[in-house]
Structures are given as C-alpha cells and as structure tokens.
Amino acid sequence: MATAPAEAHLVEPIDALDPSFPPRFADGSIHPLMTRLRAEAPVHYCRDSKYGPFWSITTHKDITEIEALPLIYSSEASRGGVSIVEPPADRQGQAMEMFIAMDPPRHADKRRVVALAFTPSEIARLGENIRVRTAARLDSLPRDEVFDWVKLVSTDLTTDMLAILFDFPWDERHKLPVWSDAITSINLIDNNPQERLNMMFEMAARFYQLWQERSNAEPTPDLLSMMIHSSALGQMDQIEFIGNMALLIVGGNDTTRNSMSGFIDAINRWPDQWEKIIANPEIIPNAASETIRWVSPVSHMRRTATQDVEFRGHQFREGDKVVMWYISGNRDERIFEDGARFIADRENARRHLSFGYGVHRCVGARLAELQIQVLISEMAARNMKVELAGDVIRDPHPFVGIIKSVPVKITRG
C-alpha cells in the first residue's frame, strides 16, 4: 500500500502512482498528480492501494464515455457501489441500497420519484426562501473579526435547506450535518467504525420513526412524504429507505456546503474575479457553475466492469474497479483552458463533471446551483469583501472534497 510523501508524483514511476492516497486531497498535490496522469497515462492501473487495485479514468472525454455505458460499467451496490471508500452498511455489514447505486432499469423508477422534488416549479417555489435565509445569514455575520465560514455560513445554509426539503423537525436539524459527516468520515471508517455505525443507526432510527408517522398521514409536498407515498419507492424495505436518506443527506449537504466554502478560497486566490462578479452581476449563474467545476466537491465516482472489455487499448476484466476522477476531468486542458484557475465568466463552465453525466447525473443539481448562485448574488449586492484569515483546511478524503475550515474576516460590506 502506498505510503509515499505527497510530492512523490514528481519522481515515482507512473506505474507506482496511487491516485487515491488520502493525504493528496488535503494538501492539494492531487492536482499535479492528475495533470501528469492526463498527459502520460489517462487510463492508469494502480495495483496496490488502501482500497485495492483499480483503474483510473482521468480525461473529460473518457469519463463521459464510461458514464454513458451503465450496463457495462455498473453502479450496483452488490458490485461495490459508486465509491472506492467503504459505503454505508447495515448491521450485518451489507452495503445499504440506494438509487444512485442501482443500474437501469431499476434506477430510473426510483430516481423519477425523487426528481419530483427538484422540478423547475419546485425549485422556483424554494427560491425566495433560499434568498431570505441567505440574506439573513450574511447580515448576521460578525464584521472585522475572525470566524469560520464553513461553520457559520456553508453548514448552516445547507442544513436549513435539507430540513426544509425533508420537512425534518426544525429543532433537530443540527443532526443532519453530523450524520452526513459520519457517513463520509475517513477517520471514523479507519479508526472507529463502531462509532460511525452507531451514528448511522441513530440516523436510521429517527428517519424510520418519521417514515412510520408519514406513512399514516396524508401526503405532503416534502421529499420524505413524496418517497413514502410513491408507487416506486413506497414498497421499499427499511434498509433501502435509510440508504436513500443517507444518499440525499450527503448529496444535499456535501456538494453545496463544500462549493460554498471553496468559493471563498477561489475569490481570495483570484480577487480580480470577485471584482469582476460585483461589476457584472449577470455572470453570477456562470460563476456558480465555475465554482462547482473548480471545487470539484465530489472527487470521483466508481464503477465496476460487468464483463471483460477493452477500453483505449487497455483490458478491463469483469469485476475490475473503474474510478472516474471528476477532480481531474474538471481541469482537463483539452476542455478547460487554464483549468486550474477560477475564471468567473468561463464560457464552458457548465461542462463540468461535478454532477456526473448521463443517467446518474445528480438529481438535485438545479437546487445546488441555485443555492450557490443566491449566496454569490447576496454577497455581491452587499459589495462584501471576505478575506482569508488563515489556512483553508481540507479533509484527506478521496471521495468527497470536504473543506473542514475556512477562517475569514469580513472587511467590507
């Protein structure tokens, strides 16, 4: 298993590189490693890693091609699911079923129900609520003193939105990010799996209680009730229900939260881009897409080959893990010129892969985009200047691009 220092990508033979080595995702060295792989070995085989052997797919074109063939490259939980990191499991250690970890045709029926909560009309209905809450949050922040943007802005805004989506008890909403962090925590997976399981069981018990309550009540427009009263999802067993709730909590929490946090990092690295946004508010929707591209809140998605297949001259065997590195495809020089830079008005920012591609494209993409757009818009309307007051701390996580802390000070607006 690789234990090389973070700068090893500069000297190691290409065959010895392990793109999943967790510290790279905390110190940023994952980006030059991926640049090297795109140039020298865009389809790369890692024989020895913490997560076993796997293939890496690193270019935008190759990722979309793999994504477009879901019956050859499977997402099924029974085959390993969508990540090389340990997935959520039940008490027997079996991976929890969730619709993201299903293949067609089963996947489409399950996804269709959840998608009802994210139609354009539903997003429009939520829009004013998002704007009011975002404005209030920004106006409540301390001025000229250091605070953690992740804690006071990113986490609070995404937690409130999740609670509204689920109609989760408002006075308990603080539990949602705690459960999300437990599901994804590399530290708990590696060092305290029982604590992780305990927290997941707590989540399961609370959502099962809500499931029982709403099963016996009239349907309401929240996502939880929609799932329970739908023909496609209403007959699912308890484990699948909890698996889907885990998916929606992590998806709704981590993608948006980490993009909101990463935006502050980006505009401090390139302050001219923030001034460009303030001067040209019409580019804000594009700037939100560029944020999602540059941050890459989901670093990879994993598939499993269902048959022997040749790809770009390489032979994949049935059962091989195939890892699509979104964090690499989002900076592919063939698609995104100067892709390591945040460029607020980048013309093709929406071609990012952070929401996936094909049948598994993120069902909540519109809502995530809206939340980020509103945050940028409300900051720009206040001519707000948010300056870093310390290092941005990232988690050593090869699946979710978790930003743990962004110490800042508001010096204007």
Protein language model regions, located:
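Cytochrome P450
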Residues: 1-413
